[in-house]
C-alpha cells in the first residue's frame, strides 16, 4: 500500500502557506473582536444618551454633502462615537436626535449659531472639496437618483445651470461665513479636505482628542468614472458666466473672484 507524502521541496512552501493562512485568520479575528467592541461601545453610548444618563460632546460636520461625509461618518463610528449621517439634523430643532447622537454629518445646518448656543463646547468640522469635482459629484448623484426613480429635488437640486450656479454661490457664502464665525475661536473649527489630504482622518481624530494615527475609511466612490460631456460643458458655461478663473476650480474653500475687490477675504481660498 503506497502512502502519499508531500515532496520534500514542497514542504517549506506548504508551511509558509499555512503560516500566512493562520496570520490572516488571526488578523480577521482581531478585526472582528475590534468591531464587536466598537459596536458595543457605540450601542451602549446610544442607550445612555437616549436615557439622558450621558452627555457627550457634540461634533458637527458643517460642510456640504458630497465632500466625503460618508467617510467622516465612518471615522466617527470607528472612534466609538454615536454618529448620525442624514438630513434630519439640518433644521437644528430635532432635540431627540441631538440627545441621542454625538456626531452629525451630511449637509449644512440651517442655523449654525443656534447649534453653537444649544451645545456649548461642541467641535465643528468644515469638510471641503475642490469646486470642480464637487459639482461633478453632485450632478452624478442627481443623475443616479433620476435613473432609479427616487429623485425628489427642486429647482436648486437639479442638473441645470441655474442649480450649479446657485451651488457655487452658496458654497462661497457658507464657507466664508463659517470661517468668519469661528475667527476668534480657532480651536473650535477644523477645516479639512478628506478627499485630498491622506492624513485627514488622523487630523480629525486628533482634533477630537484621540491620540495616534488613523486610517481614512473607504470613500463612497462614485461609480461613474468618466465625466459626461454635458456636465463638463455645463460647468464651463457656469464658470464663464460667473467670471471664475479656471484655476479656481481646484480651490476647495472658496473662489476669490466672486468677492468684491474691496472685500477680499483674510482666509485662504484653499487648504493646500
List the model feature ranges, each with a label.
Residues 9-10, 69, 74, 215:
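Residues at secondary-structure transition points
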Residues 56-59, 163, 185-187:
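A short, structure-level motif marking secondary-structure boundaries and short turns
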Residues 87-94, 131, 180-270:
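The conserved 3'-phosphoadenosine-5'-phosphosulfate
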Residues 31-170, 176, 188-189, 198-211:
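PAPS-dependent sulfotransferase catalytic domain
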Amino acid at each position: 500500500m503506497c502512502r502519499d507524502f508531500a515532496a520534500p521541496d514542497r514542504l517549506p512552501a506548504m508551511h509558509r502557506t499555512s503560516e500566512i493562512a493562520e496570520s490572516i485568520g488571526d488578523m480577521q479575528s482581531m478585526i472582528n473582536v475590534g468591531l464587536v467592541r466598537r459596536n458595543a461601545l457605540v450601542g451602549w453610548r446610544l442607550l445612555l444618551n437616549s436615557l439622558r444618563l450621558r452627555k457627550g460632546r457634540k461634533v458637527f460636520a458643517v460642510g456640504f454633502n458630497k465632500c466625503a461625509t460618508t467617510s467622516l461618518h465612518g471615522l466617527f463610528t470607528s472612534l466609538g462615537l454615536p454618529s448620525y449621517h442624514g438630513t434630519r439634523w439640518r433644521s437644528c430643532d430635532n432635540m431627540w436626535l441631538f440627545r441621542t447622537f454625538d456626531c452629525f454629518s451630511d449637509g449644512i445646518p440651517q442655523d449654525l449659531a443656534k447649534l453653537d448656543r444649544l451645545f456649548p463646547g461642541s467641535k465643528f468640522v468644515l469638510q471641503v472639496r475642490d469646486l470642480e469635482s464637487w459639482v461633478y459629484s453632485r450632478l452624478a448623484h442627481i443623475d443616479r437618483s433620476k435613473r432609479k426613480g427616487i429623485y425628489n429635488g427642486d429647482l436648486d437640486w437639479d442638473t441645470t445651470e441655474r442649480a450649479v450656479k446657485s451651488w457655487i454661490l452658496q458654497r462661497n457664502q457658507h464657507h466664508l461665513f463659517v470661517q468668519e464665525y469661528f475667527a476668534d475661536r480657532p480651536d473650535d473649527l477644523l477645516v479639512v479636505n478628506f478627499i485630498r489630504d491622506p492624513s485627514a482622518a488622523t487630523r480629525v481624530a486628533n482634533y477630537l482628542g484621540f491620540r495616534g494615527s488613523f486610517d481614512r475609511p473607504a470613500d463612497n466612490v462614485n461609480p461613474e468614472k468618466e465625466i459626461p460631456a454635458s456636465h463638463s460643458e455645463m460647468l464651463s458655461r457656469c464658470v464663464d458666466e460667473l467670471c471664475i478663473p479656471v484655476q479656481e476650480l481646484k480651490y476647495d474653500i472658496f473662489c476669490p473672484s466672486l468677492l468684491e475687490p474691496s472685500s477680499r477675504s483674510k482666509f485662504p481660498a484653499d487648504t493646500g
